[in-house]
Amino acid sequence: MNESSIRTEEDVIRFLSNKTEFERKVLVATFKIPKGKISTYKRIAEKVGRPRAYRAVASALKKNPLHPIVPCHRVVRSDGRFGGEEERAEARRELVEKEGILIENGRIRISDDILF
């Protein structure tokens, strides 16, 4: 299976068969975030049943082999800032802005209407 044929959650799971169960769960949860919405590392950790594993979520997303199909750019810190190295954070900011998310002073103002 190649990246261009991935359309469904099942496709993502099949493509990620070489990842750990935790990494697969994180990437599948991230795959579900719709355009124009964001989530946080903590919320993803909670969704996959590991509420204190938000740093592990960030680590799994850093190794995302399916970007932008699995839109890791839509996952931010709980304070609305973009995690990771500045160069990667800037690229993620640009992608999120193109999707219609408002950024003020380098961070997203997290509200219920954009939170997934």
Please report, for each region that a protein language model flagged, where it lies by residue.
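Nucleic acid-binding interface residues in structured DNA/RNA-binding domains
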Residues: 3-116
